[in-house]
A protein has these predicted regions:
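C-terminal lobe and adjacent flexible extensions of AdoMet/dcAdoMet transferase-like proteins
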Residues: 196, 214-268
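Catalytic cores of RNA-modifying enzymes
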Residues: 1-212, 216, 252, 257-265
Length: 268
């Protein structure tokens, strides 16, 4: 089996700090990620940031068709040189944030070790492909993963928790210590499995309005919900009293279902 990370390290000696590159080198964890996606012959995988291809190779050897989206030209060239004999691999040299639906298969699963500084943006971008997704397995900085998977009345609960859980059922696969990467990371990571949920709002304009309301609800976390929304909703204090029996309730106390109820009471 090709030891792609070792080959890359021997050839280049370092990763590109501009892209915050840290490659997972623990083979057991790579296998665990591939297994979480239930990859088999003919599965379509869209890998965001394949790096030097260690996880990509796991997918290819299982017979999956992999569309790898990589922004770093050096890594694109490296993958093309060492994986050229796999006809089930397509490499797109671009920033994933620029990718459109027409560039990807009609149905697929996402995978990726996401750059820490862009992971939230990338996760939100995946919601644009919601109807095409079977599953997603992503690695995040541990603290970010905790916010994504947080529940109400905890310090990590935020708009990213509500919106992520609106689109997906989320399951924690495992934590991974920084020593399992090259170069080693100073922080730990967490692997999450996402399974698309049926979207409550089928009208995209209504859905976008709901998501915007959720973001505004958390804009100043120390403030009560009525203070965060009072500029948009004149009767917010009475509505909160009616729905939650608490006109001073904070956003972090409200569940996804509660936010949906609040939106419907205000706007419909």
């Amino acid at each position: 089996m090709l030891k792609l990370t070792k080959i890359f390290r021997d050839e280049f000696g370092h990763t590109d700090k501009n892209f915050a590159q840290h490659f997972l080198v623990n083979d057991h964890y790579l296998n665990e990620i591939a297994e979480a996606l239930e990859v088999s012959e003919g599965t379509n995988i869209v890998e965001i940031g394949p790096g030097c291809g260690a996880l990509t190779l796991k997918f290819l050897e299982k017979g999956a068709h992999v569309t790898a989206v990589e922004i770093d030209k050096k890594l694109v060239d490296f993958l093309e040189r060492y994986l050229f004999f796999y006809d089930n691999l397509e490499i797109i040299h671009d920033d994933f944030l620029n990718i459109d639906k027409y560039q990807l298969p009609p149905r697929f699963s996402f995978a990726g070790n996401l750059p820490y500084n862009l992971s939230t943006k990338i996760l939100m971008k995946t919601t644009a492909f919601h109807s095409c997704i079977d599953k997603m397995v992503f690695m995040f900085q541990k603290e970010v993963a905790s916010r994504i998977n947080a529940v109400p009345n905890t310090k990590d609960y935020s708009w990213i928790s509500v919106i992520s859980q609106y689109f997906f059922d989320i399951k924690k696969i495992r934590n991974i210590a920084g020593g399992n990467f090259w170069p080693k990371t100073k922080v730990n990571s967490t692997v999450l499995l996402f399974t698309p949920r049926k979207r409550y709002f089928q009208n995209s304009n209504i859905e976008n309005e709901f998501l915007e309301m959720v973001k505004k609800s958390f804009v100043t976390k120390r403030k009560t919900l009525k203070n965060n929304l009072k500029n948009d909703i004149a009767d917010i204090e009475n509505i909160l009293e009616e729905l939650f029996a608490n006109k001073s309730i904070r956003a972090e106390q409200i569940s996804l279902k509660g936010f949906i109820t609040l939106y419907e009471r205000i706007y419909t």
